From Swiss-Prot:
Complex and partners: Probably interacts with PlsX.
Membrane-related topology note: Multi-pass membrane protein
Record pathway: Lipid metabolism; phospholipid metabolism
Transmembrane segments: 1-21, 60-80, 102-122, 134-154, 159-178, 182-197
GO biological process annotation, one example: phospholipid biosynthetic process
Record's protein name: Glycerol-3-phosphate acyltransferase
InterPro entries according to UniProt: G3P_acylTferase_PlsY (IPR003811)
Source organism phylogeny: Bacteria, Bacillati, Cyanobacteriota, Cyanophyceae, Nostocales
Compartment(s): Cell inner membrane
Length: 226
């Protein structure tokens, strides 16, 4: 059992490291020579990359951040397949019970990695794209439904942060509606709340009516008072 627990712990650690890979930071550093944490919202996510570099790099970072979430969950599935074939899973382990919980832990680790990257002094993005990748890997129907909510809101409002918040709220509702395992539902609640908390400054701007729409530049307090 000790070896099995070590394998599970290693998978969660790798999931965190995958989430920590600073795609947005590297893209902006390589293409513009600046630290993305010092411009716009200070986030390393795709939206801030979009404002800083444009649509192409923004879409590229969005895809890679989403892929990080997919890979984190795929790693868990691979572990169970490999360990089962090699008879590494203890007979006392109920796979149907363990796998959803380990998927959930790996998902949480990837989200924390993206927003608290060990490679960036525990700073990062808001974990929206990485969360989407996790949801798609957990259950593609949940992922698509959540993305659908995001897409509808962004099409109407043209505000990415509002769309992300509404998607975060929708996750747990969709999980319950589609009768997902309890660990997934708990992930939807905890992950959704975490994403919303990461948008605190956006919520303040939304309430003040100063949150930029797609294509608009974020005006900082310094620029407003200049």
């Amino acid at each position: 059992m000790g070896f099995w627990l070590s394998l599970c712990g290693a998978v969660v650690l790798v999931a965190y490291l995958l989430g920590s890979f600073p795609t947005g930071y590297i893209a902006v550093k390589q293409l513009k020579g600046i630290d993305i944490r010092e411009v716009g919202s200070g986030s390393t996510g795709a939206t801030n990359v979009l404002r800083t570099l444009g649509k192409g790099p923004g879409a590229f970072v969005l895809g890679l951040d989403c892929l990080k979430g997919v890979l984190a969950i795929a790693l868990v599935y691979y572990l169970f397949t490999f360990a089962s074939n090699q008879n590494l899973i203890p007979t006392t382990v109920n796979i149907e019970l363990w796998q959803p919980w380990l998927v959930t832990l790996a998902g949480i680790a990837a989200i924390l990695g993206h927003s608290k990257s060990i490679f960036l002094g525990f700073t990062g993005g808001k974990s929206v794209a990485t969360s989407l990748g996790i949801l798609l890997a957990m259950n593609w129907q949940v992922g698509l439904a959540t993305f659908g909510v995001f897409a509808v809101v962004v099409a109407i409002s043209r505000i990415v942060s509002l769309s992300s918040i509404m998607g975060a709220i929708a996750v747990s509702i969709v999980m319950v509606f589609l009768q997902q395992p309890l660990p997934y539902i708990l992930f939807g609640i905890a992950g959704g709340l975490y994403v919303i908390l990461r948008h605190r400054s956006n919520i303040e701007r939304l309430l003040a009516g100063t949150e930029p729409k797609i294509g608009q530049k974020l005006v900082t307090e310094t620029e407003q008072s200049a």
